[in-house]
Amino acid sequence: METKHTKFPTPPWDMEIAAERLVFEETTWNSHEPDKIIEGYADNIEMRDGVEFINGKQELKQFLKRKFEKQLDYTMKLDLWGALKGRMAVRFEAEWRDASGRWYRNYGVQVFQFNDHGYVERRFASQETISIEK
């Protein structure tokens, strides 16, 4: 069982309650603080983000540190497309810049599976990245 004291909606949920849970995801990811983000994830998290595979909270924390060192000024918007029991399907877009100042946008989909306590157990994201003008 998870030891964090974070409170958020737990499954099973409808679209409205699932959207409330996504607020936590969006807010913490936009904080760029790995310790805050991993509060919403199970210790045994299994995750794929693009071409990276992550297993466990410590790998997730290291992945996030690398991500935010490379993807500066990262902002993400999540759009719930479906929710059933402890699963969600989400469309997302994110913008960020690299160290040279060039801006990018990611478009993609994420699927989540949550445990009974509301922690993400599985998260798989497929995305494409395009260069944009700011």
Which residues are covered by each model-predicted region?
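Short beta-strand segments in beta-sandwich/barrel cores
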Residues: I45-E46, E95
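A beta-strand edge to alpha-helix "cap/lid" segment located at domain peripheries
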Residues: E2-W13, K61-K134
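Structured beta->alpha junctions
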Residues: E26, V51-E52, L80-G82
